[in-house]
Every structure is written in C-alpha cells, then in structure tokens.
A protein has these predicted regions:
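Short, structured beta-strand segments at or near domain termini in extracellular proteins/domains
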Residues: 187-195
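Short capping motifs at secondary-structure boundaries
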Residues: 1-3, 60-61
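Functional-site microenvironments in short loops/helix caps that host divalent-cation chemistry
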Residues: 11, 16, 20-178, 182-187
Length: 195
C-alpha cells in the first residue's frame, strides 16, 4: 500500500461547499476563508461526500483506495480481524463505549479522536495501544468510516470501510463494510488517500 499513513486531517482540506449552519461544523469562515477550529485541526476531515473525497484525492494526484487496497493496507498478509491483531480492547480504537477522553455521550455517539491517537502513548492519563496496521497505518478501525473508490455496475451506492466512533466494536473488523449514496456526508464519514 502506497498511501497516507493517517486519515486526512481537517487542516489539509480545501473547502468548496459546506453547510455553515450544520451543528457538526468544525470550521470557521471569515472573509471568504475557511479554517479548521483550533481544537479540531488534527482530527479527520468529516462531513465529506464520496464525490468530495474523490475530488480532493485527485486534486493532489492521489486516489481513493479501492476496497482491496484498503483491506490489504488494514490487514497485511494474514487474516487478522483487526489491523493490530486478533482481539480488540477499549484503548485500541475510537468506537461507541471505548471510553476515550474525547467521548461525548451527551450527543449521539462519540466524537472523533485526533488522527493517529491510538499509537501507544499516554494522553492526559489515558493509555492508548499501538493500533497500527502491519504497514504502519493508523485509524484503519474506528474514528470515521473511510470512503473507497469502487463503483459497482448497476449500484448507486459507494462503500466505506473501517467503522467509526458511532458503531460497536464488532463493526470494526476489517471485512465490515458500509454503504451510502455518493452524495451522503456525516460526522462519522471521512476518507484516506492512496497513491
């Protein structure tokens, strides 16, 4: 896999259409310029459609990974169910009830964690496990669903992999997939670019 080690961060994004009244908005808009709110600058880009994710990757000479590329990057060469191995612990990934410091159960689900957060370090007393894939990629399970590039004949839907902060741990297995229309966007959906 030759691609981004992490999900795309908000600070790296280019913004064309953003519903400014959306409560999940993590951007500021001032004098015609969008910027990530300081507390979200190192979090994954969310609220992006398949078309937006694809356009962003192509603008920089990359592409959305195919489902096979994504799965190979997450799994490596064996049949492990999770990018880091055989089992999951609460401090492996961001998912419902993982109890990470960013969880906000007063709203639906939990919030995203910073890109690469589950790297084996301690943050404010919270010990993470190194949850990188065999290829050293982070956030391949949990945090946000990631769009893939596959377009299947006679299907309008596009597919996402990896699970998110609003699913349970059983949906973080590498073979799990989700789908939506290509215009769908959500606080639980982001993307990763590949070369």
């Amino acid at each position: 896999f030759n691609g981004g080690r992490h999900e795309v961060e908000i600070a790296a994004g280019d913004y064309i259409y953003v519903p400014l009244d959306d409560p999940a908005l993590r951007l500021t808009y001032d004098n015609g310029t969008f910027a990530a709110k300081a507390e979200w600058a190192n979090h994954p880009v969310t609220m992006v459609s398949w078309f937006g994710a694809k356009a962003y990757c192509e603008y920089y000479g990359w592409h959305l990974p195919s489902e096979l590329e994504w799965e190979k990057a997450a799994r490596g060469t064996d049949n492990r169910p999770f990018p880091w191995g055989e089992t999951i612990a609460r401090n492996n990934a961001n998912y419902i009830a993982s109890r990470d410091p960013f969880e906000d159960m007063s709203t639906f689900g939990s919030r995203t964690t910073p890109v690469g957060f589950y790297n084996g370090n301690v943050y404010d007393g919270y010990q993470t496990l190194d949850s990188s894939s065999p290829y050293g990629l982070y956030d391949m399970a949990g945090n946000v669903w990631q769009w893939t590039n596959d377009v299947y004949e006679f299907q309008h839907y596009r597919y996402m992999r990896g699970g998110s902060s609003i699913v349970y741990e059983n949906q973080l297995r590498i073979w799990q997939r989700n789908n939506a229309t290509p215009t769908f966007y959500s606080p639980a959906v982001g993307f990763r670019c590949a070369r």
